[in-house]
Amino acid sequence: MESLNNRLDWLQEQLLTLYEKDSKDIEDQIMQWNLLRQEQVLFHYARKKGIMRLGLQVVPSLAASQDKAKTAIEMTLYLSGLRDSQYGSEQWSLQDTSREIFLAPPDHTFKKGGQTIEVIYDEDPNNSTRHTVWRHIYYQNGDNRWRKAASDVDVHGVFYLEYDGVKNYYVDFQEEANRYSKTGRYTVQYEGKRFTNVMSPVNSSPLRTSGSPTDTNPATQGQSTQTARKAETKGSRHHPKSPAVRKRRPYGRRRSRSPRDTTLRRGEGESARASAGSGERVAFISPGDVGTSTRSPPKGGQSRLRRLIQEARDPPIICLKGGPNQLKCLRYRIKASNSSDFESISTTWHWVHNKCTDRVGHARMLVRFISTEQRDRFLDKVVVPKSVSVILGAFDGS
């Protein structure tokens, strides 16, 4: 008990020293998060031993200390990567590397030099919202390299321009107007520029995407929001064919799935349907039929051979949808801990609009499996963050 008290006193003394030092060195910020992790590990150990108080400090619950320790580990990993990049030599304060700033929009990025802008709805100064435009945004791209960008504002929202010229919106003015405005009209003033959208019905569908709230060509910023919506609706008919979607998986405990009937394929006669003891006859599939099914074969009432043949038509996948940095962290974790539970995994990617390079929707990542059993095993083992959607599907070919 006394040794735990002494250890806690030492950790908190080191933290106070860092706070008073007010260092701008990223190494000190990494040290701070390491000390916070050690503090939570100590609390976790004490609680497991039934200790409810260390000195004057109340020991938090096991869940609380575990969650805070994981947060500290995550921040340490992000900051260590940033330190090893070309931006590690810049000045980094405690505020710059705080969890609150890291999760502020755009989330999972480091930010500096915040400036507040105001969006006024219905030309009523009392009906407004405020958002932050950042002078510097540090984000990771698809190959985990750190990049630096700056926020900007247009009539559609607040965004930052990525290194490949793609606008990544993190505030959608039209979506906000649909929530707070009676008329759908809003006005934004930023650095001497004034943006006002044209009148649009409040109950019309917002152009809501993670990457780009408008999904329209930047050259059409002066056009009406309603016209932009028509462009999006028209463009949606020409999106590339997506993997066949079956259903979303709820978070937490897996939901049992009832068997589905499988339609009879070309080349399958009555022999493929008949099953008479050991003399079961099955029709083998042609190479052209591989990967063409979009249904899961029934799990019961058939031999393993028949199931394998049916699965050959249906290479199963899952599509993970969420924030790009969240997906990158998840990919790193499952490659390190669950490499035997999947066949291959993609990099993060986005749909883009058919008229321009603006990104459409959340980031996505595909995981491919050799069988539905392997996919089920993967979903049973891997804990997916609540903010990441899981969609089951299949490729039209492998």
UniProtKB/Swiss-Prot annotation:
The gene coding this protein: E2
Region annotation Disordered: where it falls in the sequence: 197-304
Protein name listed in UniProt: Regulatory protein E2
Family to which this protein belongs: Belongs to the papillomaviridae E2 protein family.
Post-translational modification: Phosphorylated.
Residues covered by region (DNA-binding domain): 314-398
Alphabetical UniProt keywords: Activator, DNA replication, DNA-binding, Early protein, Host nucleus, Isopeptide bond, Phosphoprotein, Repressor, Transcription, Transcription regulation, Ubl conjugation
Linked residues for Glycyl lysine isopeptide (Lys-Gly) (interchain with G-Cter in SUMO): 321
A single GO molecular function term of this UniProt record: DNA-binding transcription factor activity
Keyword Electron transport assigned: no
Biased composition (Basic and acidic residues): 258-271
One Pfam family, short name: PPV_E2_N
KW Iron-sulfur (keyword) present: no
Subunit structure of this chain's protein: Binds DNA as homodimer. Interacts with protein E1; this interaction greatly increases E1 DNA-binding activity. Interacts with protein L1; this interaction enhances E2-dependent replication and transcription activation. Interacts with protein L2; this interaction inhibits E2 transcriptional activity but not DNA replication function E2. Interacts with protein E7; this interaction inhibits E7 oncogenic activity. Interacts with host TAF1; this interaction modulates E2-dependent transcriptional regulation. Interacts with host BRD4; this interaction mediates E2 transcriptional activation function.
Function in brief: Plays a role in the initiation of viral DNA replication. A dimer of E2 interacts with a dimer of E1 in order to improve specificity of E1 DNA binding activity. Once the complex recognizes and binds DNA at specific sites, the E2 dimer is removed from DNA. E2 also regulates viral transcription through binding to the E2RE response element (5'-ACCNNNNNNGGT-3') present in multiple copies in the regulatory regions of the viral genome. Activates or represses transcription depending on E2RE's position with regards to proximal promoter elements including the TATA-box.
Transactivation domain: region residues: 1-205
GO biological process entries: DNA replication; DNA-templated transcription; regulation of DNA replication; viral DNA genome replication
Biased composition range(s): Basic residues: 236-257
Chief localisation class: host cell
Composition bias type Polar residues, residue spans: 197-228
